[in-house]
């Protein structure tokens, strides 16, 4: 469990539990 909302550059996608500084998104 981490963040559910991604930063602006990932907006509209799902964030991985490593959403801290650079969030990685999966489609």
UniProtKB/Swiss-Prot annotation:
InterPro entries: Scorpion_toxin-like_sf, Toxin_alpha-KTx_8/9
Purpose: May play a role in blocking voltage-gated potassium channels Kv1.2/KCNA2, Kv1.3/KCNA3 and Kv1.6/KCNA6 to a lesser extent.
Note: Negative results: has no effect on rat Kv1.1/KCNA1, Kv1.4/KCNA4 and Kv1.5/KCNA5 voltage-gated potassium channels.
Intrachain S-S bonds: 3-19, 6-23, 10-25
Family: Belongs to the short scorpion toxin superfamily. Potassium channel inhibitor family. Alpha-KTx 09 subfamily.
Domain notes from UniProt: Has the structural arrangement of an alpha-helix connected to a beta-sheet by disulfide bonds (CSalpha/beta).
Tissue localization of expression: Expressed by the venom gland.
Subcellular location: Secreted
UniProt-listed SUPFAM superfamilies: Scorpion toxin-like
Molecular functions per Gene Ontology: ion channel inhibitor activity; potassium channel regulator activity; toxin activity
Protein name: Potassium channel toxin alpha-KTx 9.11
GO cellular component, one term: extracellular region
Keywords: Disulfide bond, Ion channel impairing toxin, Potassium channel impairing toxin, Secreted, Toxin, Voltage-gated potassium channel impairing toxin
Origin superkingdom: Eukaryota
């Amino acid at each position: 469990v981490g963040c559910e909302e991604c930063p602006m550059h990932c907006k509209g996608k799902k964030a991985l539990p490593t959403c801290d500084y650079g969030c990685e998104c999966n489609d």
